[in-house]
Design a protein with these regions (language model features):
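Upstream accessory/linker segments immediately N-terminal to the RecA-like ATPase cores of bacterial MutS
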Residues: 142, 149-180, 187
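Short, charged alpha-helical interaction segments and adjacent helix-coil junctions
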Residues: 2-9, 17, 67, 71, ...
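Accessory alpha/beta interaction modules
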Residues: 1-153, 163, 222
Length: 268
């Protein structure tokens, strides 16, 4: 596996940095959502990229790639996913729950909860059915025409789809996610792709964006090194027979993190 960081010029939309910068454009974000959902959206508020929801001091917070509201108070969370993790459906559930808690304050009626979409754009087929789009909504098992009506929708888009289940615009857009080039955009029939490419080129040509990208890469490297050092300390104590709870206390680390590192170590 090649761990060498990409140059900003080599980024595709599947890369978080470029995806967030492109989706921070109100009009592009609105049109992407319209195309994915096949609905009309009059207006969206300024999209928030890398929105953090950390509601509980001792809980696990989340960072959302793109978080946006439209003129009807519908909430959209769009995530770019390149790693095929078996916990992806439960991650979608966890994101949904945190968004709900963030939307409604204590004492407010449940009616204040808004319609929400949690959308994962995946560079793999999680469900292995060949579809480009998988949409999930709570329905009655005994009567699948009966919808629960909690207004929560989870969608998983697949750039590797093979079925003829969506229109050509969606197919082209999903291909473009992994092949974000001027050549692809020029040959595309989807007008949205051509407009996204203009934004992509503006981001890649910006010295300010390049500095920001390089700064994030450096921070990621430092965090990985810090994580590696912490992992070595945990394993060293564990091999000495120190209890997990004691390791957590001694190193001032979350017990959940300590247990995960030990599980990973034992599975090698």
């Amino acid at each position: 596996m090649n761990d060498v960081p990409k140059n900003i010029k080599d980024l595709n939309l599947e890369d978080d940095f470029l995806f967030a910068k492109v989706m921070s454009d109100n009009e592009i974000c609105r049109r992407v959502l319209e195309q994915i959902l096949n609905i009309s959206i009059k207006k969206v508020e300024s999209p928030i990229t890398q929105k953090t929801i950390d509601l509980l001091l001792d809980g696990k917070g989340i960072r959302l790639d793109v978080y946006v509201n439209d003129d009807k108070d519908t909430v959209y969370n769009v995530e770019m996913q390149r790693t095929k993790r078996k916990d992806l459906p439960k991650r979608a559930r966890y994101y949904q729950g945190n968004i709900d808690l963030d939307l409604i304050t204590a004492g407010k009626p449940y009616e204040d909860l808004r319609k929400t979409y949690v959308i994962f754009i995946c560079t793999f087929d999680f469900f292995n059915q060949g579809r480009h789009v998988y949409t999930f909504e709570n329905i009655c098992k005994e009567d699948n025409k009966l919808i629960l009506g909690d207004e929560t929708i989870k969608m998983f888009l697949n750039t590797k789809g093979t079925l003829n289940d969506v229109n050509s615009d969606i197919k082209e857009f999903l291909q473009y996610i992994e092949t974000t080039t001027a050549e692809f955009a020029a040959s595309a029939n989807n007008r949205l792709i051509k407009d996204i490419q203009k934004k992509v080129e503006a981001v890649k040509d910006s010295k300010e964006m390049e500095v920001e990208y390089m700064t994030l890469l450096q921070r990621d490297r430092e965090n990985r090194e810090l994580g590696r050092e912490e992992g070595l300390k945990i394993i060293k104590l564990y091999n000495k027979g120190v209890d997990k709870q004691e390791i957590s206390s001694e190193l001032n680390l979350d017990l959940e993190l300590v247990e995960k590192i030990i599980r990973d170590y034992e599975s090698i």
